[in-house]
Amino acid sequence: MGELAFLIFGRVIPGAVFVFLATVQVQLLAPELKVAYNDASNIGAITLIINRLLFLAFVSAVAMIYVFRKPPALGRREPIAFAVSMYASFVLLALGPVADFIHAPVAFNSSPTAILVSNVLLISGFALAAYSLAYLRFNFSILPEARAMVTGGPYRLVRHPIYLGEIIAGFGLVVTLLSWFSLAVLISFIAAQLYRTYIEEGVLVEAIPGYAAYRLKTPHRLIPGVI
């Protein structure tokens, strides 16, 4: 990738996308903070605010990473790699709007229990993703790219903890949007994340000496002792 192409597609466009996502979270926070201020015992509102703040921290950090990170040592740009990476990164964010557009049978479950469970899962997922990002830092990328190997923190337990956090958050989202359509989207999202790990690790093994040994030392991609 040339310098101009990297500037446009590796910095400006993805950075702008995550700045937009951060801006949306800030706008959504204002009325939710007002609700929590007026009713400090509203656990649903408080957990939703925590969820928003964690997601805001995550997307803000990603936006900054895209501005300052270096070009990759190696990357894959094939259509399948691009499509899977984009789908896994953004499909859950588009679940509600797409369901409305195609008139899918998705109804919001507003019961206090569903909202609480949803927010706990969302908070857990975003917290894990943000914690993992603090270790991955400027090596983060949506597309399959190799910059440096990270083995500390959550990467001692699994090789793709950010994706695990996103999957946990995905379950949290679907709890309040439960339908056959949302379940199908969630299953396809998890499948895309799994396939994404195979594509990325092919790049990392090829570009980074020692990554093959790290895979042997840390044998699980997403869940310790399972997969």
Spans of model-derived segments:
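Membrane-anchoring alpha-helices and their flanking helix-loop junctions
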Residues: M1-L143, G172-I227
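Solvent-exposed interhelical
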Residues: R147-G165
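Alpha-helical membrane segments in multi-pass integral membrane proteins
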Residues: G165, F171-G172
